[in-house]
């Protein structure tokens, strides 16, 4: 394929993830998007997570609990575009994987529960999006229920998430009185027809808010609705494509995912406005998405994707060029050329061999323990993609063995699980404890389960007096040595051998930062 043809193909790609607070409707929206992209024929309501529809749950523990702990990847075609959707665990407990998945996308869809507004998980995920000024499109969900005043929800997005919000459409009524949405840019009313499961309701439109049909539909409410729309126009931001691409403004759509309404309009806007694959920074140079030379990085490693094989799949975001079956690529960290004949692509748990993939696509490489998160692969050039960080854990436990003779297996298991990003492990300098850190409680359960299942090690967790962790470094060796001497009780080495400060309280961390101004305390660490 000639370069111009490759550039055309790349321009069609839209790679994004959905962020939301648990139960805001993310899984339902994911299903409806796949439905519009003809990727699934039946949108089974997600309440039946253990049913045959639960395409993305394949670790046994997930199947037992009916939650998606692992991020899946789904690709579907829509309106001459190719959409790559990276699913992020939305359960009450999520993990660092969720954060890292956001480093592999070009834009994000934020789903907000219209009744609850902006919730704390959304705030956290938004902070990660801010690291790269990721463009964000918003969908305010559950309009067929009684929700908060839409103006209030918009204000909350602006105040709490510090981003301008530009409504593209506006709801007419809500709950039982929900009539549909009015598009502020096309002067069209889209009538609400409830579509369930795999039925896509017909898009019934009325042109013109001042038309006779609109008056007939709205009856006694007609004047109120027109006044409200006037006020909304005056009081909200107008959509601006450049501001959206810069991560400064979010276009907002209203609808109901369960009622299958408003998702199509949102998807139409998304494929039209969301950026195609973006250029990426490496330590050496900027890599353009439409370069001929192949490059990509690993953002996630998933064990046991196939219970029959103890394999681990490394998820790679292709950043430039093209992957084709059987090609050679350079594993930069190891300085080795590897031939990749069996990369896989995914429809949530269905694995199929991939013939080729281009910039913006996600492929899975079989990993026998040699690939780590953050690894760069290229067509030979020495490159190291940046911006794929470790995030400081927020929860900590000491880990103890039921059988002390299995220390070796425990250390090997923890080493592998930390390389994979399932947990972070810390070895304090002054004692023989092993401390594990995580972003969500569920990560601890996953680690205990997998140590037992894969490494035959039974471990017990105990509370430990650690509130937060920071990676530390200092350019002045003398000052670093003094810091290490005075603070050795709080220092540990992480799984990669990096010096880490384990703070018992936030106050302790603040005092240490003040006391040692030459030491950098970092909440993230590049891989």
Swiss-Prot record:
Name of protein: Peptide chain release factor 3
GO cellular component, one term: cytosol
Similarity annotation: Belongs to the TRAFAC class translation factor GTPase superfamily. Classic translation factor GTPase family. PrfC subfamily.
Record carries keyword Nucleotide-binding: yes
InterPro entries: EF-G-like_DII (IPR053905), EFG_III/V (IPR035647), G_TR_CS (IPR031157), P-loop_NTPase (IPR027417), PrfC (IPR004548), RF3_C (IPR032090), RF3_dom_3_sf (IPR038467), RF3_GTP-bd (IPR041732)
Keyword Acyltransferase: no
PANTHER family: PEPTIDE CHAIN RELEASE FACTOR RF3
Organism of provenance: Teredinibacter turnerae (strain ATCC 39867 / T7901)
Molecular-function annotations in GO: GTP binding; GTPase activity; guanosine tetraphosphate binding; translation release factor activity, codon nonspecific; translation release factor activity, codon specific
GO BP terms, alphabetized: regulation of translational termination
Alphabetical list of NCBIfam families matching this protein: prfC, PRK00741.1, small_GTP
Gene that encodes it: prfC
